[in-house]
């Protein structure tokens, strides 16, 4: 149980990013990791120069989460909510994406998720509670722009989160963009442990899941992206890098096949994990914007 508890603390709690070790990053995220860091680094001065407004929400369990709202240079009532990945932040995932949305008529709200680098709280629930947190921001934006469209765009854990939100009834949401989402926590950990260690330590994982259930009062299997998209209420664009080593591209096909709503699948040739937006940025922008255009209310 001791090993499982340590693993629980490493995986489901806020911690320093494991991707600081470049050798580990190259193995699990692929050679695109350095390319991704470079692209975001080049876009960072622009991102930091943006005038932001903090929009805070209070979660059901007492956390205060801050979102960074950036108004479109041209007056707009349409907003994209960007949901970052595991142990990350808006600065870590969205310097590139933010710009093309702002330049194409959208306000942008970047969330700081629970357990993320800048987020309140220490617990990471892989979309289970994050979906409810993000729904609070949806409500805030809908109050500000009651006639506007809201797009949910998430990357990695954020992609899984917006998939899990697709079955919720949400004000003004017209489309979901899911970039490199996993099908479930269980599927992802089975895959990742085998890829990294060469085998899947099922007994240890099961003990870790039991600790999660005891801590949070629900199972990791109760809410999953795969289950949620099967009841999707909104159009979904599924994006995935073909060379993703962290979350396999096969999961994008599973999510796509399970979704009964309007949908598209965009597989980015040569892209590693979370790197689709920088591997072919012009095509990524055009595909997402065209999809959203066809979904506006």
Model-found features: residue ranges?
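Hydrolase active-site cap/lid region
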Residues: 164-218, 267
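Short beta-strand/loop motif that positions the catalytic acidic residue
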Residues: 231-233, 238-240, 244
């Amino acid at each position: 149980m001791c090993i499982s508890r340590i693993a629980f603390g490493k995986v489901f709690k806020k911690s320093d990013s494991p991707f600081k070790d470049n050798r580990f990053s190259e193995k699990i995220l692929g050679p695109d990791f350095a390319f991704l860091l470079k692209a975001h680094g080049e876009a960072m001065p622009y991102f930091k120069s943006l005038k932001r407004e903090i929009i805070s929400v209070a979660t059901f369990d007492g956390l205060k989460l801050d979102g960074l709202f950036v108004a479109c240079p041209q007056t707009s009532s349409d907003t994209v909510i960007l949901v970052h990945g595991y142990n990350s932040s808006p600065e870590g995932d969205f310097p590139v994406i933010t710009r093309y949305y702002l330049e194409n008529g959208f306000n942008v709200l970047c969330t700081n998720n629970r357990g993320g680098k800048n987020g309140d709280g220490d617990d990471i629930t892989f979309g289970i509670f994050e979906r409810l947190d993000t729904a609070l921001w949806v409500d805030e934006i809908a109050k500000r722009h009651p006639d506007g469209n809201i797009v949910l765009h998430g990357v990695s854990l954020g992609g899984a989160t917006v998939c899990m939100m697709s079955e919720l009834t949400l004000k003004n949401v017209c489309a979901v963009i899911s970039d490199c989402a996993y099908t479930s926590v269980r599927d992802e950990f089975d895959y990742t442990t085998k890829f990294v260690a060469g085998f899947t330590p099922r007994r240890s994982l099961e003990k870790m899941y039991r600790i999660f259930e005891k801590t949070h009062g629900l199972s990791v299997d109760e809410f999953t992206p795969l289950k949620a998209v099967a009841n999707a209420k909104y159009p979904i664009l599924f994006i995935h890098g073909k060379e993703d080593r962290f979350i396999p591209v096969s999961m994008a096909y599973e999510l796509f096949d399970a979704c009964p709503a309007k949908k598209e699948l965009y597989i980015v040739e040569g892209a590693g994990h979370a790197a689709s937006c920088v591997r072919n940025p012009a095509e990524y922008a055009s595909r997402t914007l065209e999809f959203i255009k066809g979904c506006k209310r």
